[in-house]
Amino acid sequence: MSSYFVNSFCGRYPNGPDYQLHNYGDHSSVSEQYRDSASMHSGRYGYGYNGMDLSVGRSASTHFGASERARTYPANSTSASTEPRYSQSAAASHSPPPDPLPCTAVAASPVSESHHGVKNSLGNSSSTSSNSSSSTHISRDGVGTSSGTEEDTPASSEQASAPSDQSTAQPSQPQIYPWMRKLHISHDNIGGPEGKRARTAYTRYQTLELEKEFHFNRYLTRRRRIEIAHALCLSERQIKIWFQNRRMKWKKDNKLKSMSMAAAGGAFRP
């Protein structure tokens, strides 16, 4: 239970003699408006409660500084002479407690009276040992829980990264749609390892269109060759070579036909 909770609970029940908060010591030494948690000694818990901060990693020697930081918010109980001591930073609370105040200062202000009560409670060896053991136990539990959360965090991150790795591994091979395929075999391997150009395979549609064009005109202008190349998804070089080969074949066929006709005509001569 922190000192903030105790102070807020005491403010809810301002009448000290009518309501004693969990047997927290003598109510006569505490003002009605503000009940100091450091001057209350709990009979329920097995240690002297002096307003210590039960956070992780604090030692028993810093209880005095923690109780001072816990009492900074009530304005009516702080004096101008002790304000610089209460405005210390969190890093300064790890230092050993300051020197005790003189007896005149103890009798002067209620805050110094609470300091005296803290000193008396710290003077008890059994309560100090129980404080140190309880704070050590709490710090161990806190460290254990924090380490558990830190161990759970990498496991959850690994589980989250596993599906992402699977999702990134799936699209490694892009899907090829039909309109991405070429209608003819690629002729990029002209300068192959064997020095031979691969034979270009034309589709049935491409061969039919080229035969139609050759039937109308055996020679093509460059403009017409570009149009046919775009229409058949071929290059100008392929169109030119196909027409050259087709003309050579046509000449050969005509020569054989003429030779056969000549031979046949000579045989039927009288």
Swiss-Prot record:
Q: Which InterPro entries match?
A: Antp_homeobox, HD, HD_metazoa, Homeobox_antennapedia, Homeobox_Antennapedia_CS, Homeobox_CS, Homeodomain-like_sf
SUPFAM superfamilies, per database record: Homeodomain-like (SSF46689)
Q: Which GO terms describe its cellular component?
A: nucleus
Ordered alphabetically, the record's keywords are:
Developmental protein, DNA-binding, Homeobox, Nucleus, Transcription, Transcription regulation
Q: Where is the motif Antp-type hexapeptide annotated in this sequence?
A: 176-181
Region (Disordered) residue ranges read: 67-173
Q: Where is the composition biased (Low complexity)?
A: 124-136
Its name, as the record gives it, is Homeobox protein Hox-A5
